[in-house]
């Protein structure tokens, strides 16, 4: 496998630096060359830039105020260096750099939309209220009827109340509710259109793990309309869902809208039986639940679905790294906390051109050779986490990565920033340590050691302050203080020290995933999230985040939440 990935990495470098793209005149040369000319061809060398310049001029003329002009670049035109394409790692998709900015990429937007607009609400508490307080009978037939009512109401349609305005179905066609349960007997009675079938979506072993964790409980996987969460925020998801749940119970079970039991149903839907994707942030970051800063690394690992369709533990982790770098670096830190150009190329370093993949699969072979197959799927084959093991694997990984950059200067040109290289080197080391030990905090130790080795070798990591969290991170891997020493799976973008800067959080998420994909676990932290997103009806395919980003870049991805129906045709 490592040899195949190495060949693909070299092919990606050739596509990027030895073949002409647009009119950048990159034909010829070798990917190991140490020198090359900057031809200073300007932005017109790139097809997308030409399109953007044309659009910018037309818009400026139409609105009468200056707009996009790449000549406003510190007195020198954009495009002094060659503008080169990216290959999406793990795929053959080649795309324009600009098309990996999330504003230009509908798939990236939809990935976050699909997370933000989702919540999980338990059914059992509501059913107990109906049975014990109201004397209602709850059967598979009544549950199916309730779900039919709910799928009418959840997009914003009326029940119970007459003469209420409603949302147009064509604007909210991505909104629906399904249920799942660990009770096979109940699942058999649920109308299949409403069921996420654990036995169908997961392997036999994974399904057994998940059902053992969920037990006989039943849950609703709720996806409110994309257009709603875009207009409001992530905190609206549970409120929108709870309102429609309450009205649907009233309608389906012939309740009186004003009776006291409605308050219990509402409390269950809004609080007691609610599982949000992300936690509320403190006031200084002022974000409610279901916003990126509150999405833990373990939750993201469970949202990504690669573990359902692949038995390759390294690939499973790399897909989470890609998803995490896009969400945490490009959208969270790059816009929520910063803005504008954002931090796109911190993230692309981890999911393009197979540079991280090449390093990781080298590590897999190294671990399997030295530690008797410890990087293959299994629980009994793991090497015990220790400082010596972490030092060995992380050092080997980092030195290989550094040597690759030095042997292939094109990889250095690709990852032109020190912080990009630091992210990739440390992510490979951390994922490798996690795979070998089945211990995510050992993976964190590998990440931090990689940073120290990198700085020792090359004298610096990234921009000033990039390595703040890395300089103090090792001391907190096993701290007794809960806010410092959390397992990696429970940490997130708002964990102390992690909120400082880019180029880290996606790697931490991949490290969390690697510990569990290496063990063959069906989920990382929460089986409810793993099942909730095991659903082909979602617009974004969470089994292949990187490929979806590529489809968005080449304009093949079809998003939800569009307003074409209610605006003039162009």
From Swiss-Prot:
Chain positions found as Pros-methylhistidine: 271
Subcellular location: Cytoplasm
EC number assigned by the record: 2.8.4.1
Flavoprotein recorded as keyword: no
Record-listed coenzyme M binding positions: 346, 464
Modified residues ((Z)-2,3-didehydroaspartate): 470
InterPro entries to which the protein is assigned, alphabetical: Me_CoM_Rdtase_asu, Me_CoM_Rdtase_asu/bsu_C, Me_CoM_Rdtase_asu_C, Me_CoM_Rdtase_asu_N, Me_CoM_Rdtase_asu_N_sub1, Me_CoM_Rdtase_asu_N_sub2, Me_CoM_Rdtase_Fd-like_fold
Sequence positions that bind coenzyme F430: 161
Entry note: cofactor: Binds 2 coenzyme F430 non-covalently per MCR complex. Coenzyme F430 is a yellow nickel porphinoid. Methyl-coenzyme-M reductase is activated when the enzyme-bound coenzyme F430 is reduced to the Ni(I) oxidation state.
Catalytic reaction equation(s): coenzyme B + methyl-coenzyme M = methane + coenzyme M-coenzyme B heterodisulfide
Location of 5-methylarginine modifications: 285
A UniProt-annotated Pfam family: MCR_alpha_N
Keywords: Cytoplasm, Metal-binding, Methanogenesis, Methylation, Nickel, Transferase
Pathway(s): One-carbon metabolism; methyl-coenzyme M reduction; methane from methyl-coenzyme M: step 1/1
Cofactor: coenzyme F430
Cellular component, GO annotation: cytoplasm
Modified residues (S-methylcysteine): 472
Family statement: Belongs to the methyl-coenzyme M reductase alpha subunit family.
Reported function: Component of the methyl-coenzyme M reductase (MCR) I that catalyzes the reductive cleavage of methyl-coenzyme M (CoM-S-CH3 or 2-(methylthio)ethanesulfonate) using coenzyme B (CoB or 7-mercaptoheptanoylthreonine phosphate) as reductant which results in the production of methane and the mixed heterodisulfide of CoB and CoM (CoM-S-S-CoB). This is the final step in methanogenesis.
UniProt name for this protein: Methyl-coenzyme M reductase subunit alpha
């Amino acid at each position: 496998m490592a040899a195949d990935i190495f060949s693909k990495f070299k092919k990606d470098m050739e596509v990027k630096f030895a073949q002409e793209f647009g009119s950048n005149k990159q034909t010829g040369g070798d990917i190991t060359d140490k020198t090359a000319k900057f031809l200073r061809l300007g932005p017109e060398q790139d097809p997308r830039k030409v399109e953007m310049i044309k659009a910018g001029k037309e818009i400026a003329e139409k609105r009468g105020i200056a707009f996009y002009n790449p000549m406003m670049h510190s007195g020198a035109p954009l495009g002094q260096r060659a503008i080169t394409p990216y290959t999406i790692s793990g795929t053959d998709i080649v795309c324009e750099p600009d098309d990996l900015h999330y504003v230009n990429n509908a798939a990236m937007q939809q990935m976050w939309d699909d997370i933000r607009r989702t919540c999980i609400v338990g059914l059992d508490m509501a059913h107990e209220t109906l049975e014990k307080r109201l004397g209602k009978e709850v059967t598979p037939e009544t549950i199916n009827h309730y779900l039919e009512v709910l799928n009418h109401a959840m997009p914003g349609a009326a029940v119970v109340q007459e003469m209420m305005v409603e949302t147009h179905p064509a604007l909210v066609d991505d909104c629906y509710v399904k249920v799942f349960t660990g009770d096979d007997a109940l699942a058999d009675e649920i109308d299949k259109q409403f069921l996420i079938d654990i036995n169908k979506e997961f392997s036999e072993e994974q399904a057994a793990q998940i059902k053992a964790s969920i037990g006989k409980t039943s849950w609703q996987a709720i996806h409110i309309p994309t257009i709603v969460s875009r207009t409001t925020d992530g905190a609206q998801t549970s409120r929108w869902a709870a309102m429609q749940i309450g009205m649907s119970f009233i309608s389906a079970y012939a309740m009186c809208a004003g009776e006291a039991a409605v308050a219990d149903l509402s409390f269950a839907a809004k609080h007691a039986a609610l599982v949000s994707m992300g936690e509320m942030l403190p006031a200084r970051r002022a974000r409610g639940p279901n916003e990126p800063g509150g999405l833990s690394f373990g939750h993201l690992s469970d949202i990504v679905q690669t573990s359902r369709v692949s038995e390759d533990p390294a690939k499973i982790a790399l897909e989470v790294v890609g998803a995490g770098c896009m969400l945490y670096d490009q959208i969270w830190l790059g816009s929520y906390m910063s803005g504008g150009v954002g931090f796109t190329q911190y993230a692309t370093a981890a999911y393009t051109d197979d540079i991280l993949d090449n390093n990781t699969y080298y590590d897999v072979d190294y671990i399997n050779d030295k530690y008797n197959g410890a990087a293959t799927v299994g629980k009994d084959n793991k090497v015990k986490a220790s400082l010596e093991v972490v030092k060995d694997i992380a050092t080997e990984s980092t030195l290989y990565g550094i040597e690759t950059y030095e042997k292939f200067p094109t990889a250095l040109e690709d990852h032109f920033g020190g912080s990009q290289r630091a992210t990739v080197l440390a992510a490979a080391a951390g994922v490798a340590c996690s795979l070998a030990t089945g211990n995510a905090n050992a993976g964190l130790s590998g990440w931090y050691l990689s940073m120290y080795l990198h700085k020792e070798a090359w004298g610096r990591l990234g921009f000033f302050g990039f390595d703040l969290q890395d300089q103090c991170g090792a001391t907190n891997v096993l701290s007794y203080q809960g806010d410092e020493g959390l397992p990696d799976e429970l940490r997130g973008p708002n964990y102390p020290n992690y909120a400082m800067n880019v180029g880290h959080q996606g790697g931490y998420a991949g490290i969390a995933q690697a510990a569990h994909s290496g063990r063959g676990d069906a989920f990382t932290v929460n089986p409810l999230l793993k099942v909730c997103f095991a659903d082909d009806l979602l617009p974004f395919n969470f089994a292949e985040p990187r490929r979806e980003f590529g489809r968005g870049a080449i304009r093949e991805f079809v998003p939800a939440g569009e307003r074409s129906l209610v605006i003039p045709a162009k």
